[in-house]
Amino acid sequence: MIIYRDLISHDEMFSDIYKIREIADGLCLEVEGKMVSRTEGNIDDSLIGGNASAEGPEGEGTESTVITGVDIVMNHHLQETSFTKEAYKKYIKDYMKSIKGKLEEQRPERVKPFMTGAAEQIKHILANFKNYQFFIGENMNPDGMVALLDYREDGVTPYMIFFKDGLEMEKC
């Protein structure tokens, strides 16, 4: 399995269990997710071992809640954040500088294509700004990557967009 981590915060962003495709001439990765519901707080009797107690009513004392969300967000503990268009412009400008610096150190051949492609992609993001929800890694590092969540035309299928050059891959 491959884990994709944020190059700056080192937070886990997603893994290769999802359908991943390159978009924007290889500048970004689009990761398709699913809406899922999970029950939290419910303890399965098979995990406890032994027999269920005969002393009290069945299920007493266990409260469970059902949480519904996008599997990528829930599995990798991504945290939702919000931006005004102006705040996002400021963030993305600083983020691009950070990634450019990392690329200059590690992969100088990627600097020019990244900077050229990023400008186009940012125009596209800003043009569709109201469609997106924004997510950052578990540690909520404000300098790290902000992933974008949108839904396909069907209104049901969620997908997330990540800048490919802002990710590092870790084989597990």
UniProtKB/Swiss-Prot annotation:
Entry's induction text: Down-regulated in response to enterovirus 71 (EV71) infection.
Function: Involved in calcium binding and microtubule stabilization. Acts as a negative regulator of TSC22D1-mediated apoptosis, via interaction with and destabilization of TSC22D1 protein.
Tissues expressing the protein: Found in several healthy and tumoral cells including erythrocytes, hepatocytes, macrophages, platelets, keratinocytes, erythroleukemia cells, gliomas, melanomas, hepatoblastomas, and lymphomas. It cannot be detected in kidney and renal cell carcinoma (RCC). Expressed in placenta and prostate.
Pfam families on file: TCTP
Entry keywords, A to Z: Calcium, Cytoplasm, Phosphoprotein
Domain of life assignment: Eukaryota
Listed SUPFAM superfamilies: Mss4-like
Name this polypeptide is given: Translationally-controlled tumor protein
Protein family: Belongs to the TCTP family.
GO cellular component: cytoplasm; cytoplasmic microtubule; cytosol; extracellular exosome; extracellular space; multivesicular body; nucleoplasm; nucleus
Spans annotated as Required for reduction of TSC22D1 protein stability: 70-172
Subunit structure: Homodimer. Interacts with STEAP3. Interacts with TSC22D1; interaction results in the destabilization of TSC22D1 protein.
Gene: TPT1
Location in or out of the cell: Cytoplasm
Occurrences of domain TCTP (ranges): 1-172
GO terms for MF: calcium ion binding; DNA-binding transcription factor binding; RNA binding
Gene Ontology BP terms: calcium ion transport; intracellular calcium ion homeostasis; negative regulation of apoptotic process; negative regulation of ectoderm development; negative regulation of intrinsic apoptotic signaling pathway in response to DNA damage; regulation of apoptotic process; response to virus; stem cell population maintenance
Modified residues (Phosphoserine): S46, S53, S64
